[in-house]
A protein has these predicted regions:
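Short hydrophobic beta-strand micro-motif common in sensory/regulatory domains
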Residues: 114-121
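Conserved small/polar residues in nucleotide/adenosyl-binding loops
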Residues: 126-127
Length: 128
């Protein structure tokens, strides 16, 4: 299976419109959650050129680094710490245009300037 998610249009709405059906096809038959997360990160980064895309998985009271695409990342983030830990603790999406203005920001990479964190609080990828 060879799939390219590179986009040629600069229109953001059009890019998402083109991405979604292709992405749904990519993950439609896969049952392994880690594999789906890995390809999700790769597809999003390729399609939109994001600096870093990835997942942290909950283990006890920490977020543990999961599948990602981009530069190296922090292995563990405690609940309520940094943008990711705060998003998880508050159960809400956080959009941070300037990470240097976010109290308690964890600088995993000095190249990262902004973050969008979407907590996936309960997820069942497939039922059978």
């Amino acid at each position: 299976m060879e799939t390219s998610f590179k986009q040629t249009t600069s229109n953001k709405v059009e890019r998402y419109r083109l991405f979604l059906p292709q992405f749904e096809l990519l993950i439609s038959d896969e049952k392994e959650e880690i594999s789906v997360l890995a390809n999700t990160a790769a597809a999003l980064r390729e399609a939109f050129g994001f600096f870093w895309v990835g997942f942290y998985l909950v283990k006890d009271d920490q977020l543990i680094l999961g599948p990602f695409q981009g530069s190296t990342a922090c292995y563990r983030i405690h609940k309520g710490k940094g943008v990711c830990g705060t998003s998880w603790a508050e159960a809400r999406t956080l959009i941070v245009p300037n990470v240097e203005q976010f109290p308690g920001h964890i600088a995993c990479s000095s190249l990262s300037r902004s973050e969008i964190v979407v907590p996936i609080l309960a997820c069942l990828l497939y039922t059978s």
